[in-house]
Amino acid sequence: MQALDGHLHVTGKSGYIARYRAPQNSLSYPGDAACAQDASCHKVDSGQYAGDFWEGNTSRDQYTGWFFGMAMAYDLIDDEPTKQMIATDVAEVVHALMADYWWIVDVDGQPTTAGPNIMSPMRATWLLIAYHMTGAADFKAQLQSLLTDKARLGYDIANIDIMNHYTQYYGNNLSHTTWYNLLRLGKVYFSPADYQWFVESFDQHETFTRLSHNAWFDEIYMSQGPYAPANPDPYQTQLVDDLTDFFAAPNVEYALPARTNFTMDPMSELLNYLMTEIPFLQQIMGNVQPQALYAFPVPQQCAGDFLWQHNPFVITACGNDNPEHTYPGVDYLIGYWLAEYHKFVTKDM
């Protein structure tokens, strides 16, 4: 929690979270070497964080992870000083966003150039988290304005995710991470009708990610969505299989050859053709490559820093055999932890 607190306060700008923070001259990532040429890189030479550097131009992606970590820690620990620190930090960030009309504003007074506008689902989730921690009237009032019937169109537009099936797949991770606390806390604070609307919206929009050999996504659906266990239960079976199949530590980078046994997704072929014939579509929507109709099991997915945010439908060769490049393993840890927390697996499994 000190790390998340530090990411907020190292910037010196109230309510603005750093994209990254580390000691200067770090052996693991000497990113401060670029500070002389990169306007978003900042060295700190005085105060509490003297000797650190941080990167700005922060996006809603980083804010999503920061809020998720703060929200979960707040409800899972019983250390009151730490809980108060979390609540104070969250309130500071949300107040800054409210003051800037839900844009992430950098230290230069301008919105960042990397996803700075906060869309309805994230606004509601972060306000809900802040209200949950503080009970502040201003958070409640703005949250209520996002729960009116006329506000629902904003959620529907923000939740359109068809292209995240084929490009910018990481967007599915951001949406699932947001949905988790929106539904978890919405169950407590929303009216039954509003809560049910959000559950149904989640069910309608997050479809192609289910049973896609993504333990993280399935756990969020199983714990917060309209999941009804069957007998036999494909969700439970695949969840256990995916966690069991996860790569043993150390989780090093590996080369994966092109997959050969799969059914092609015809929509991906069509989109690839259209973008070849009409290049400006690629500029608008991103590059689409032909991919499989069904997700590959974990051992046949490309290596990555956080496996669950990468596309499991990729058919091309990827990665390199590089035992010196070790991934942190947080993807397995969060996948296992959430499954155990919600009793989908037990510690003796």
Describe every region a protein language model picked out:
Residues 2-116, 120-121:
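Extended ligand-binding groove/face enriched in aromatic
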